[in-house]
Amino acid sequence: MLRWLTLLSCILLTALHGNIVEDVGAAQQASYPPPPPPFPFNVIVILPKRESTYDNFGMTLQKAMPVIDIAVQEVIKAKKLPPGWINLTYWDSRLYEDILLAERHATVGVIQAYCEHRLDAILGFADNYGLATVTKVTAGLNGGIPILTTSGMPSLLNSKKEYPFLTRMQGSYRLLADSMYQLIAYHDEDSVSKSNSSLNYLNLIFFYHDKRRAVNRVIAQDESQETGATSSHCYFSLYAIKRYFTEKSKTFKREWALNTPQFPFDEDLVIERETFKQWLREISLQSNVIILCASPDTVREIMLAAHDLGMATSGEYVFINIDVSTGSHAEQPWIRANDTNNEENEKAKEAYRALKTISLRRSDLDEYKNFELRVKERADQKYNYTNITGKDYEMNNFISAFYDAVLLYAIALNETIQSGLDPRNGHNITSRMWGRTFVGITGNVSIDHNGDRYSDYSLLDLDPVQNRFVEVAYYSGASNQLKTVGQLHWVGGKPPTDLPICGYDKSKCPGYPLHVYLLMGSFLLILVLVGLFIFFWRRYKLEQELAAMSWKIRWEELDGEESQKKNEKKKAKKRKNHNDYLPESDPLLRSTSRSSVNSDKFDEDSLIPIRFRLRSSSSGTTRKISAMIDRKLSIFTRKKSTPPSESQKNGGLTPNSLQKAENGDCSPINEVQFRLPLNDRRVSSPSSEATRKKNSNEEDPENGAKKSLSLKNRKLSFGMVSFKSGSGGSVETIAQNNTQIYTKTAIFKGVVVAIKKLNIDPKKYPRLDLSRAQLMELKKMKDLQHDHITRFTGACIDFPHYCVVTEYCPKGSLEDILENEKIELDKLMKYSLLHDLVKGLFFLHNSEIRSHGRLKSSNCVVDSRFVLKVTDFGLHRLHCLEEINLEEIGEHAYYKKMLWTAPELLRDSNAPPMGTQKGDIYSFAIILHEMMFRKGVFALENEDLSPNEIVQRVRKPVSEDQEPLRPWVSETGEGEGDDALNDTLLSLMVACWSEDPHERPEVSSVRKAVRSLNRDNETSNLVDNLLKRMEQYANNLEGLVEERTQEYLAEKKKVEELLHQLLPPAIADTLIAGRAVQAESYDCVTIYFSDIVGFTSLSSQSTPMQVVTLLNDLYLAFDGVVDNFKVYKVETIGDAYMVVSGLPERRDDHANQIAQMSLSLLHKVKNFVIRHRPHEQLKLRIGMHSGSVVAGVVGSKMPRYCLFGDTVNTSSRMESNGLPLKIHVSQQTYDILMQEAGFKLELRGSVEMKGKGMQTTYWLRGYKDVEIPDFGEEFA
């Protein structure tokens, strides 16, 4: 019957030439068209051309067309359909403001399009009435017309018997009702479906906009004028909530059986704020849980009225706003830019604290954000949206859903054609759209078997810290679960009760006689006065404490390095007579390591002070510690002892040398391994002072330059040495170009404290005028006391010495301990240190500090009792004054500090300076990985990334199918030392560095997990805990000392070998022993002098590098010859070469050795080739003389072994008066040589020498079968 009526309608409409419907996208055809070809498929988009009061979701053609355009382009680009297969026609569904006329207009237009074969699918509809009518009509056309709508959410459209081809891209209000039910609904044993709600509200009232049922509705005299009064979307949404609640809960069904608490109104009429106040007074007598549904402007007026009545600030009322159209992007809905009264915005903000909003969940994918930008650009460029409407384009979920609708239709159409079925049959298309999931612009889109999308809803709440509405929970339509992702903030600190104690009308509270009220009033007045007195007294005391600034430390009170240097000089004078002390003025001390082992072996006497120091460092815990240490150290006494004299000769330890450290700050083991000046905690490599300065860029402190120590040299055993830097630094270890500097220390009131310099520019802040907030921050820091955080001693704000003073922990930081490969940490020690860290972090999170913000392994320090403490926390307002100089710090060090920072804080340009507790949990996970694997911070398996590259990759957001960059974890779960990691600890680490901060555990959960692992190792008895830690520490003592001793011996041997090359071995050994070298006279020695003839001319014709190369090659060759004879090379000066025989080892054949050496040198010169002048013969001139000399060491810096006497001068004259490539011999040397057979000498004759007169000299021609080489006739 319906088909016959449709055919009749087609005939009538054709006769009328189709002039009823206005076609926005294409011209109307005047004649009836022929049957359609297979392609294209005609899709009609039916939406209002302009906004209307009936359109609550902002759905217009101007907004939808750019979205549909992009969707069609993406379908063609993805090859789901070829170009030209879809023909879009846009209709204005609102030619008439009257909704009933608009409904008829749309229905007639659809029938006409069908009759003209221009209808294959329908997309759109902003009102439910027109949608319902058209859906019913098109169900009977041919095989049905598929309709896809982004609205149509009322439960009345759920019936697929009446609406068999309707697909709803936003689902139905039933999912909204389910989310409300799980959030607030009261549930008891009679409930059909249990709710997980913690609010458990039963007394609800609906306060919403609806023209048809409004209490302020204007009754028209003519009933025909009321046809436009239709039900609003608020009514449909609240109707769905009522229906769902009564289905799921028998209690609600019983309570709402007769009447549903509601208060509808017409917001299109002018409503004064006083009217809203009157309505809210009436509502407050019925319920304190008010469910709102109206436009954003109306909701703001209602909340302002509630604020004026005190309902929004009392904490007794809660407002739940249903706003599905605005979306979850409305972060500050209380602000109105056109509101000239700024106080109204502030008042509205305060009122919105009592408001919770439920809206469709907004996608936060990057693809969706890019899609929004593309749509806005298309709307302005192609459709001139901004100029036509006068406002910026704004996207919402109902508009963006058109993209998913086009994509879904294209997928179903493609599959229908591929299956060989009729693509114009509505059943074939609809059956392929329902019950499927596909990837849309908002992510995964799921359509149920009823044609409704599984929509997600967000619960938004005003975050007082971020000053905006944020998502605290969301409802997943696919899983029908409400998931919490944040914390609700309630006025008054807790949610209001469902029913006030006295009832809404105060009828449940009985009255009392007048005298009772007087007594109660008097009592309350006294309490108020007492309270005011206490308040003002405490405030007065607080102000006094703030003004006193007990934390303030004057720079003069810090006994720093200058004072320590003066004391050091005084103490050095007293120690000069000790045999075991090497004065710093001794040049040999500067040429060797500044940190050296004092003896090769240890004797019983040297261990007495060590035991004493170890006992005294335990603060007198019990005799058990001393006994245990004695057992561990007694192994050294079983070794062969060195006699005291030998020990002193080698710079060994004595009780006196150990006793001098009793007043210092170094640990006892420091005295076993290293000789350090008192109060100096610096550590250097075993290289010479000059080499150390060159390699580490360190300069003399007297010159005011900075110092740095290499990372390699910094690594020492756990608890072995205390450290100190002359250039300051921070409490944490500061990395600068592969160097490490520990914190500066000072003496404050007799106690060693750590100094952290604040990088505050003195020029910018010549005076620190602290605000009240900063003073409060410093006071809170001063009041903090806990076993596992460093004690805040105070701060210095004297210009320009801005610094923070804290407790000094001499064992170094956790980072240094982990980086030192020599330190073996067993599982119990790791758990113990980890437990200390968690306890310190737990205290901070529950204190007024709230969070650390800069947690890293270098901010975890270990004190002398092996207790780990958290440091460098708090004082965030003071740190805000600091400036970061990237050039001074270095890029590597700057980004390395960020490796512990949580990804959400890296992405947030306005991250809170104090950090977050969830950020601290992430930092804890990175530290935990460092401790378990000991591969360094953020160790990766097969990637060699710089800290900058790691930070950038961690900062970059990741999608759900991507794995975020995290430190490498072995698949077998093996940690450092091939120990299998505890599964609980591994799971805890992975959970703590989760990408989503909401998925990270609280610190209380972390503490509980770590405490369960360390239960056997940690007791409540401090002494027992200390005993265990001391025993663990002492277990490695023997191996560490032995290993360091061997390292020392190897370094000592290298230094001695180098020194023996600079000085005669006997002289060097005398200086090493600390004894002065006495000058010694020698009756007869032979001295050799030589130089290069024409060297000055040769140098002027050569480059400096060529000259250096020449001399180096020549002297290396000479040194090889000299080593074959019993001679001593004295020195080389330029081209001059001086050798002596007969000293320091006395021998009679000194002239013989020098003569043979001279002949060998001439033979070496014969074959010597000058690199840059290979064809030129090097001309060596040699002179030698015998006589008496005096030899001794001259100078304290760069000591030289020098010869003195007339013999030296005569030898030099013999050389200068000789000839090239000949050996000039004096009369004295001639007399000695002639006593031995074999030497061939030729008389030269008398030669006049400066200062000597005429001297008879000789030429040495050969020795036995060795002759002078033949250099040619020129040199014969």
Swiss-Prot record:
InterPro entries: A/G_cyclase, A/G_cyclase_CS, ANF_lig-bd_rcpt, ANPR/GUC, Cyclic_nucleotide_synthase, Kinase-like_dom_sf, Nucleotide_cyclase, Peripla_BP_I. ATP binds at residues 723-731, 756. It catalyses: GTP = 3',5'-cyclic GMP + diphosphate. Residues 1017-1063 form a coiled coil. Mg(2+) 2 binds at residues 1091-1092, 1135. Residues 562-601, 635-709 are annotated as: Disordered. Expressed in head neurons, ventral cord and tail neurons, body wall muscle, hypodermis, somatic gonad and intestine. Isoform d is expressed specifically in AIA interneurons. Residues 567-577 have a biased composition (Basic residues). Residues 717-1013 form the Protein kinase domain. Residues 1086-1215 form the Guanylate cyclase domain. Its EC number is 4.6.1.2. SMART domains: CYCc. The keyword Metal-binding applies. The chain crosses the membrane at residues 516-536. Mg(2+) 1 binds at residues 1091, 1135. SUPFAM superfamilies: Nucleotide cyclase, Periplasmic binding protein-like I, Protein kinase-like (PK-like). Glycans are attached at residues 87, 196, 338, 384, 387, 414, 428, 444. GO terms for cellular component: axon; cell body; dendrite; neuron projection; perikaryon; plasma membrane. Guanylate cyclase involved in the production of the second messenger cGMP. Regulates olfactory perception in AWC sensory neurons although may not be involved in the primary sensory transduction steps. This is Receptor-type guanylate cyclase gcy-28.
